[in-house]
């Protein structure tokens, strides 16, 4: 059964947000969605079903080579500052690493030269092609980048404020019940980025 997960969000353990897990759970329950909490350089410490909503813990790794979302690897992955060492470590742990907002914020295509960005994109798992804080043009460039490298595209709102919640998400062909399912389905490419209609 298909389901939508908003893969990129920040809560009380990120410094630049006033959102809490309860805010996401309340809105996700109304919309019938699941949510990932991806704190800056910290693995969110709550996961599983919370008040009827699936919560998936992840990390947004803020790296000299750009910003990356990680699922299925421990928090100590942030200690790997060299990007290919980080990617290898995440994969050894059985996780996935996502190029977050590659053309906006401190995305990989803004952090390094095009040749290095291409090498990095070739090694990550999917590319975030829809980001709630990125411009339409930057999202389109990310979509083309993912296609050029044969990578799945995923989406997340990157919410830091209430008005930013549940703008973008990722539709999975099969039901996700935990981080293990999420990692497997991303690896198999059984996912696509979607815009979320919050007026439902």
Q: What do these predicted regions represent?
A:
Residues 1-17, 21-26, 45-77, 85-88, ...:
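Charged catalytic cores and adjacent phosphate/nucleic-acid-binding surfaces used
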Residues 39, 101, 157:
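Short beta-strand/turn micro-motifs composed of small residues
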């Amino acid at each position: 059964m298909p389901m939508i997960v908003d893969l990129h969000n920040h809560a009380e353990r990120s410094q630049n947000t006033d959102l809490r897990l309860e805010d996401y759970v309340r809105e996700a329950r109304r919309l019938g969605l699941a949510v990932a909490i991806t704190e800056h350089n910290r693995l969110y410490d709550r996961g599983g079903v919370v008040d009827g909503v699936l919560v998936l813990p992840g990390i947004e790794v803020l790296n000299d080579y750009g910003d990356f979302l990680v699922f299925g690897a421990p928090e100590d992955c942030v200690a790997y500052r060299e990007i290919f060492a980080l990617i290898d470590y995440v994969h050894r742990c059985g996780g996935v690493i996502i190029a977050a907002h590659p053309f906006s914020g401190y995305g990989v295509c803004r952090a390094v030269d095009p040749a290095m960005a291409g090498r990095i994109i070739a090694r990550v798992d999917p590319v975030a092609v829809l980001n709630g804080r990125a411009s339409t043009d930057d999202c389109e460039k990310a979509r083309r980048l993912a296609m050029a490298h044969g990578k799945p595209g995923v989406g997340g709102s990157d919410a830091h404020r209430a008005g930013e919640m549940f703008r973008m998400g990722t539709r999975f062909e099969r039901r996700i019940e935990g981080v293990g399912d999420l990692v497997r389905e991303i690896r198999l490419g059984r996912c696509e980025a979607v815009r979320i209609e919050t007026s439902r």
